[in-house]
Amino acid sequence: MDRPGETTHFGFRDVPLGDKQTLVNDVFHSVASRYDLMNDLMSGGLHRVWKDIMINALDPPRGDRPFALLDVAGGTGDISFRAAKAAGPGFHATVCDINSDMLAVGRERAAKRHLETQVDFVEGNAEALAFADRSFDAYTIAFGIRNVPQIDLALREAYRVLRPGSRFLCLEFSTVEMPGLDKLYDLFSFKVIPPLGRMITGDAESYQYLVESIRKFPKPNAFADMIRDAGFARVNWQTLSGGIVALHSGWRL
């Protein structure tokens, strides 16, 4: 639900709250076809390590026991494919993303991996999920929640669709905490990533937004408080690679 008159940030710009989703959609329509390649180039391949750590924390069952994962903002399927590889035959993932171009990439990748029966793709909004209460055994969101206009609504929706005893996991860029690395990281982010985006995708502005959006995202302790406010218990986090990213966890008890 929009909040008339309110503003939010789109990168370093202040925009009307109701406009942010359209602006974010335009970013991902523009970069969808080269999104995963850019992730490799921007992170030096480290995003693969971070995602594997997330899947290890998820620890999906390896037997026949049914296990339903909701992967939000997971359009290209990377998290769900990794989870399916780690899980047993009872595993099923639903990828929910608001961007149709990202979902198209994910569906194509699922077909190439012969995962159509284990992973399906649904266009939807993290702030208003079209799923019944207590439908899923886990909820993951990787590098997506900072793009949601109303993060508090998305967190409440995550809580709503999880069954009691289920886990919320969020992997997101964070605040670099290692002295010296912070300056190098800022230099790389603002001087290298947008030109790299122009070279690979033809779009520097989208990557300018992405690096700015990281700086506007709450610090790990503040984001943990938001997760608790949504109803989750046993909330904790770990920072990775000197604080470049953080993995937050919470449980619906």
UniProtKB/Swiss-Prot annotation:
HAMAP family, alphabetized: MenG_UbiE_methyltr
Residues holding S-adenosyl-L-methionine: T76, D97, N125, A126
PANTHER family: 2-METHOXY-6-POLYPRENYL-1,4-BENZOQUINOL METHYLASE, MITOCHONDRIAL, METHYLTRANSFERASE
Physiological role: Methyltransferase required for the conversion of demethylmenaquinol (DMKH2) to menaquinol (MKH2) and the conversion of 2-polyprenyl-6-methoxy-1,4-benzoquinol (DDMQH2) to 2-polyprenyl-3-methyl-6-methoxy-1,4-benzoquinol (DMQH2).
Gene Ontology BP terms: aerobic respiration; menaquinone biosynthetic process; methylation; ubiquinone biosynthetic process
Species annotation: Bradyrhizobium diazoefficiens (strain JCM 10833 / BCRC 13528 / IAM 13628 / NBRC 14792 / USDA 110)
Record-linked InterPro entries: SAM-dependent_MTases_sf, UbiE/COQ5_MeTrFase, UbiE/COQ5_MeTrFase_CS
Entry superkingdom: Bacteria
Protein name per its UniProtKB record: Ubiquinone/menaquinone biosynthesis C-methyltransferase UbiE
Pathway: Quinol/quinone metabolism; menaquinone biosynthesis; menaquinol from 1,4-dihydroxy-2-naphthoate: step 2/2; Cofactor biosynthesis; ubiquinone biosynthesis
GO molecular function: 2-methoxy-6-polyprenyl-1,4-benzoquinol methyltransferase activity; demethylmenaquinone methyltransferase activity
Family matches, as Gene3D superfamilies: Vaccinia Virus protein VP39 (3.40.50.150)
Catalytic function, reaction form: a 2-demethylmenaquinol + S-adenosyl-L-methionine = a menaquinol + S-adenosyl-L-homocysteine + H(+); a 2-methoxy-6-(all-trans-polyprenyl)benzene-1,4-diol + S-adenosyl-L-methionine = a 5-methoxy-2-methyl-3-(all-trans-polyprenyl)benzene-1,4-diol + S-adenosyl-L-homocysteine + H(+)
Disulfide pairings: none
Gene: ubiE
Transmembrane annotation, as ranges: none
NCBIfam families: MenG_MenH_UbiE, PRK00216.1-3
Entry EC number(s): 2.1.1.163, 2.1.1.201
Family assignment from sequence similarity: Belongs to the class I-like SAM-binding methyltransferase superfamily. MenG/UbiE family.
Keywords for this protein: Menaquinone biosynthesis, Methyltransferase, S-adenosyl-L-methionine, Transferase, Ubiquinone biosynthesis
